[in-house]
Design a protein with these regions (language model features):
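Generic structural signal for small/hydrophobic residues in well-ordered secondary structure
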Residues: 37, 41-42, 66, 124, ...
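General secretory precursor processing signal
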Residues: 44, 48, 152, 295, ...
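Flexible mid-to-C-terminal extensions adjoining Fe-S/redox cofactors in radical SAM and related proteins
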Residues: 10, 16-18, 24-29, 51, ...
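Residue-level signal for mature regions of secreted extracellular proteins and peptides
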Residues: 34, 38-41, 285, 303, ...
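Short, flexible loop/turn elements at secondary-structure junctions
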Residues: 41, 89, 116-118, 150-152, ...
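Conserved alpha-helical substructure of the radical SAM core
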Residues: 2-144, 226-227, 238, 373
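Radical SAM enzyme [4Fe-4S]-AdoMet core and its adjacent flexible, acidic
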Residues: 1, 106, 137-294, 298, ...
Length: 373
């Protein structure tokens, strides 16, 4: 996000979001779309069982949206600023570059963000290069962020991710992405860590290693139990007190490096500091600490064409199916069910530290935003 976009697009949108939150105007289009493009995954993570969806026949792979269906959905949505792609493993979709091209054609995002388990370096690099060429041709100002996951150093990473040899492929992927970033100025390489009971004891080692790689940014978020991940009841989440202490140490390192950042990068890192403090309080207090704008600023699209207010409420409180309304986003977005779910969120009947929603919440909450400025 650059300063011009924030001042001319993002911040003015927050005024409309606040009015919609209080029921004073119809809900405008969201600024963030997260699209789970597939539930196929080669990882066998201790923190996530999404890979079991097809082997255990929870759903059928043939139910996933086609490229043409995706184009129809995007065409009905209008502009989205942040386009987050997730999975499953996104790079296992052969048409991933075509999905990004459809997003460029219809959503016109400023940022495209894709995480990866880094198990298929050649596929990741070839598809990334195809996407970068699409951006070069159609949207040279759009940034592409690829975020390999790093949950431990060496053997621990393979143990947590459940695939022997993942560590070596991760290093290969990061190296090749870093080389690709030298050719394409709009490619950003980021590292992400899921903080769980399996790696909470070695976050300092992980962070020191990440910084030695020279990547542009690093972020972490807490492991959560979600129906989406089929991990309800799994002992994966650190206690609130543990997470708060971990994030306190992590924040100290971020603050120490703030002076080395460019002005806007300092604001971005400061937003993360606010998030870490907020997430620690949410996990500890088990409540919404600031108002949540899920289903207003952000929306989640499943591989099957269902809209969720967020991936945490997901199966429990879906907004509706786009396949049932001829792929017309507005019909679900402005439905009575969507209004009912937004009331539930506003009444603070749920709470979670979901990162991409939390950043939108911070931008819409003036006291929190001022902390980052």
């Amino acid at each position: 996000m650059n300063a011009k976009d924030f001042l001319t697009y993002i911040y003015p949108k927050t005024i409309a979001f606040k009015l919609a939150y209080h029921g004073l105007i119809p809900v405008p289009r969201p600024i963030t779309l997260t699209f789970s493009v597939t539930n196929v995954c080669q990882s066998r993570c201790k923190t996530c069982n999404i890979w079991k969806i097809y082997p255990d026949k929870h759903r059928s792979f043939s139910d996933e949206l086609t490229t043409e269906e995706i184009r129809k959905i995007f065409k009905s949505m209008g502009r989205i600023y942040f386009f987050n792609i997730s999975g499953g493993e996104p790079f296992l979709r052969k048409d991933l570059p075509e999905i990004v091209e459809a997003a460029i054609d219809f959503l016109r995002p400023a940022i495209v963000h894709i995480p990866t388990n880094a198990l298929a370096p050649e596929k990741i690099i070839s598809q990334s290069q195809r996407m970068l060429e699409i951006l070069k041709d159609k949207a040279p100002g759009t940034a592409l962020t690829i975020k390999p996951s790093l949950d431990g150093v060496g053997r621990l990473h393979d143990e947590i991710r459940g695939v022997k040899g993942n560590w070596d492929k991760l290093l290969e992927t990061i190296s090749q992405l870093s080389e690709l970033a030298k050719q394409y100025h709009n490619l950003h390489v980021e590292i992400g860590t899921v903080v769980s009971n399996f790696n909470k004891h070695c976050l300092d080692e992980i962070e020191d290693f990440v910084h030695s790689l020279g990547v542009q940014s690093y972020r972490n978020e807490i492991a959560e139990q979600r129906e989406e991940f089929l991990n309800i009841g799994d002992p994966i989440t650190p206690t609130g007190a543990e997470y708060a202490e971990l994030m306190k140490r992590f924040a100290e390192k971020v603050r120490a490096n703030l002076t080395n950042k460019r002005p806007l990068a300092r604001v971005t890192e400061s937003l993360r500091l606010v998030y870490y403090e907020l997430a620690s309080r949410i996990v500890t207090e088990q409540r919404q600490v600031i108002p949540c704008y899920a289903g207003i600023t952000n929306v989640h699209l499943t591989p099957y064409g269902e809209l969720w207010p967020c991936c945490v409420l997901g199966y429990a409180k879906p907004l509706g199916s786009l396949r049932e309304v001829d792929y017309d986003f507005r019909k679900v977005w402005h439905s009575s069910r969507a209004r009912q779910i937004r009331r539930s969120i506003k009444n603070r009947e749920c709470s979670c530290p979901l990162a991409n929603q939390a950043y939108s919440n911070i931008i819409c909450h003036t006291p929190s935003l001022l902390k980052a400025l």
